[in-house]
Amino acid sequence: MDVRFDKSFLKSLEKYNDINLLNKVDKAISNCESAESLKDIPNLKKLSGFKNYYRIKIGSYRIGFELIQKRQIRFIIFTHRKDIYKKFP
């Protein structure tokens, strides 16, 4: 899949210094890039009530992204699970 990053996603990543957590985020992004379809992405869930918005679970953290086209996704936010649904979508 074609992966794009919002400035808000990159800015939210800068808040975290935990190398293990950032490695897991990198692995999740790599999984998205190599995936043929959304079904191939682990820990993925569609957000109810929204047509093209999904989240990827990484422990207590979430990555929020939007499906722009069939094979193109845009990462929007990375934050703790208690905050993701306040800020996304």
Predicted segment positions?
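Arg/Lys-rich, positively charged N-terminal/basic patches that mediate binding to nucleic acids
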Residues: M1-A28
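Enriched for short, Lys/Arg-rich terminal
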Residues: D2, K7, I19, I58-R62, ...
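Active-site micro-motifs of SAM-dependent methyltransferase domains
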Residues: K11, N31, D83
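A short, surface-exposed loop/turn module that caps and links secondary-structure elements
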Residues: S30-R55
